[in-house]
Amino acid sequence: MAQNPIVTITMENGDVIKAELYPEIAPNTVNNFISLINHNFYDGVIFHRVIKGFMLQGGDPDGNGTGGPGYEITGNGFKNDLKHTAGVLSMARTMIPDSAGSQFFIMHKDAPHLDGEYAAFGKVTEGMDVVDKIACVTTDYMDRPLEDQKMKTVTVETFGVEYPEPETV
């Protein structure tokens, strides 16, 4: 069996978060995330919404929670049993199920009410201390960090496996 892809998020300050992606759990979501990474979509993008004890949300090129890649992806069409525990990566979306694009979140703490509702697709393997540090920054009333928490680069190691472009709505 092939090794799962590993994502490396290098923050502007040099801190690193590594996460394993789960294509067997959320194939289209993983395909989309890898495609965006390969197009340098996340480089220079901030975590625009940070809620200590809940999650860090990023992936919006506009930096305000309204932006995306210009398309939306289809859901995975099957049950996703990955629980929203600390360190899990999941796709942000509107209230419409097939509305995810590029925004994702990293769980700071467990949030079982999200299980089965959002497409969880990976988990932090290194750098939970970095997630904790970002989760503790001072934010404004809209949960936006007062100091930008910028992803300098986001890269992925696919171990030679080719992942297709995502299915879009």
Label every PLM stretch briefly.
Residues M1-V169:
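Cyclophilin-like peptidyl-prolyl cis-trans isomerases
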